[in-house]
Design a protein with these regions (language model features):
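An N-terminal boundary/leader segment
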Residues: 1-2
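Disordered regulatory segments flanking catalytic cores
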Residues: 18-19
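Alpha/beta-hydrolase superfamily serine-hydrolase fold, recognizing
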Residues: 5-7, 11, 23-309
Length: 309
């Protein structure tokens, strides 16, 4: 591994860790039964994951949301999504599993993807012990995490022991084969620039030819390869250089017969759900929450409870 690449990756990770406190909610805002740290076995070593347990009296197995953080496959930590995970666990009564997957360049494609899928399979295997429903699992992520999430959903198609019922794809990188210089924004200096994307891609792909693999570049999957994918909530931002590939992926999913709820947020750039504007971020979080609520069929359960009250 080139020394300069390794050093730059470590600097980005150090910055990401310093930033994690910015995204952690006061626990009192969304009270939960517990947040626990688990280590899940995988071929790449134990995968650290934060489990957000809802404070629910339901005797029914819990639905599960598997969250994959962003960071260009190179940096980022699950704590960046802490506020989001607390909100979903509290508001939906689901178990949220926030995964600290292995990072490039030490662990290039497909390690992070395959480890995330291994976590999903472990959850299904441990469903009875954990008290979860392996037939009501959703996956999602932001930026690079959105890429991994839709890849995990693809790998899970037709699985015998689990079912992914929804995918959240939030301003995701979906085409690693396209020259980053061709990914344009109307801003002179968008938050995510071509140079940084090029660096992330060089770390994640040990061979540039891997960029053509649909599991690395979901947009390059054929329509037939996307048939049977779960419904999606897909979010893009007006000024984000990844906007066009997100919109193209939404259209390709629709051509494959997949139900897609899509929204482009005007006046926003990459990572706006975490950095603001706050009004747009709140609308995006609510859109994602609503997508999961419908997928988990919580509205029907709530309606039934009200009818019996």
């Amino acid at each position: 591994m080139p020394l300069l690449k390794s050093l730059k990756a470590k600097l980005l990770r150090a910055f990401a860790k310093r930033m994690k406190g910015k995204f952690v909610y006061d626990a009192a805002q969304y009270p939960l039964r517990a947040v626990t740290e688990e280590f899940i076995p995988s071929a790449w070593g134990p995968a650290r994951a934060l489990f957000y347990w809802p404070n629910t009296e339901s005797a029914q197995p819990l639905p599960v949301y598997l969250n994959l953080h962003g960071g260009g496959f190179v940096a980022g930590v699950p704590e960046h999504d802490d506020s989001y995970c607390r909100r979903l666990a509290h508001n939906l009564g689901c178990l949220v599993v926030n995964v600290d997957y292995v990072l490039a360049p030490e662990h290039p494609f497909p390690a992070g993807l395959r480890q995330s899928f291994a976590v999903l399979e472990w959850l299904a295997e441990q469903a009875a012990t954990l008290g979860i429903d392996p037939q009501r699992i959703a996956v999602g992520g932001h930026s690079a995490g959105g890429n991994l999430a839709t890849g995990v959903a693809n790998l899970a198609r037709g699985h015998q022991r689990l079912r992914v019922v929804h995918q959240l794809i939030d301003y995701a990188v979906l085409d690693l084969a396209q020259d980053p210089a061709l990914k344009l924004s109307s801003l002179d200096k968008p938050l995510l620039g071509a140079g940084l994307v090029r660096f992330f891609n060089s770390c994640y792909l040990s061979d540039p030819a891997q960029a053509r693999d649909p599991l690395a570049s979901p947009l390059l999957a054929t329509v037939d390869e996307l048939r049977g994918m779960p419904p999606a909530t897909l979010i893009t931002a007006e000024y984000d250089i990844l906007r066009a590939e997100g919109e193209a992926y939404a259209e390709k999913l629709r051509r494959a017969g997949v139900t897609v709820t899509e929204r482009m947020f005007a006046g926003c750039d990459h990572m706006f759900t975490h950095l603001g504007p706050d009004d747009s971020a709140e609308q995006a979080w609510q859109l994602m929450e609503d997508g999961l609520r419908g997928a988990f069929q919580l509205e029907a359960v709530a309606s039934g409870a009200e009818a019996l009250a």
